From Swiss-Prot:
Species the sequence originates in: Rhizobium etli
EC number: 2.3.1.184
SUPFAM superfamilies: Acyl-CoA N-acyltransferases (Nat)
Catalytic activity: a fatty acyl-[ACP] + S-adenosyl-L-methionine = an N-acyl-L-homoserine lactone + S-methyl-5'-thioadenosine + holo-[ACP] + H(+)
Disulfide bonds: none
InterPro entries: Acyl_CoA_acyltransferase (IPR016181), Autoind_synth_CS (IPR018311), Autoind_synthase (IPR001690)
Family to which the UniProt record says this protein belongs: Belongs to the autoinducer synthase family.
Name used for this protein in its record: Acyl-homoserine-lactone synthase
Keywords, comma-separated and alphabetical: Autoinducer synthesis, Nodulation, Quorum sensing, S-adenosyl-L-methionine, Transferase
Molecular function as annotated in GO: N-acyl homoserine lactone synthase activity
């Protein structure tokens, strides 16, 4: 099940936000060792606090969240314009009301085994495509690890790479995902098939390499 969260829902749906921010701390700080700000077991940054992000989450019937991502309009403050800017030699000029940035792509500790984790990742991307299509967003921009290229291909929504990071940063790319009805249909069909099949990808690849 997919849900949309916005910052004004923090007090009325505190459980969902608590699970999401705790999961981000567990994955990004504890597992991956990223230098992120964690307070009271919540991983939040200035975009969560000062901007107006939209969050997309996957949820079990029990209410437990299994995955999440964050969306920000590129006409405002984004990580690509600031934190990620020094990763790339060439300037990445993405500033459009129809292009939104996706960051904090996270498979939560409750995502499950390998098959279930890949299903969560696919459900998040399928939901992202549908949400974007319904709201007039034409492109999604994000930073991803090279290890995710094969995963995106298998899921059925591959980005167009815009730039590659400097070697000392790692093997990161800025990519642009086209939002089209065909892509959304492909994602929905692949998700349906995936629910009946075993995943060829370990959950760790999906957690470690998704959109940052």
């Amino acid at each position: 099940m997919l849900r949309i969260l916005t910052k004004d829902m923090l007090e009325t749906d505190r459980r969902a936000f608590d699970e999401m921010f705790r999961a981000r701390a567990a994955v990004f700080r504890d597992r991956l060792g990223w230098q992120v700000d964690v307070r009271d077991q919540w991983e939040r940054d200035r975009y969560d606090e000062a901007e107006d992000p939209v969050y997309l989450v996957t949820q079990q019937p029990s209410g437990t969240l299994t995955g999440s991502l964050r969306l920000l309009p590129t006409t405002g403050a984004t990580m690509l314009k600031s934190e990620f800017r020094h990763f790339f030699d060439q300037p990445i000029d993405v500033d459009s009301p129809t292009t939104w940035e996706c960051t904090r792509f996270c498979l939560h500790p409750h995502a499950g085994d390998m098959k279930q984790s890949r299903a969560v990742a696919t459900e998040l991307l399928s939901g992202l495509c549908d949400l974007a299509l319904d709201t007039g967003i034409e492109n999604i921009v994000g930073v991803y690890d090279v290890a995710m290229v094969a995963v995106y291909r298998r899921i059925g929504w591959r980005p167009t790479p815009l730039a590659r990071s400097r070697p000392e940063i790692g093997k990161l790319y800025v990519g642009l995902w086209d939002v089209t009805a065909d892509n959304c249909r492909t994602l929905r069909a692949n998700l349906s098939r995936l629910l009946e099949q075993a995943s060829p990808y370990p959950a760790r690849v999906l957690v470690d390499g998704g959109m940052r």
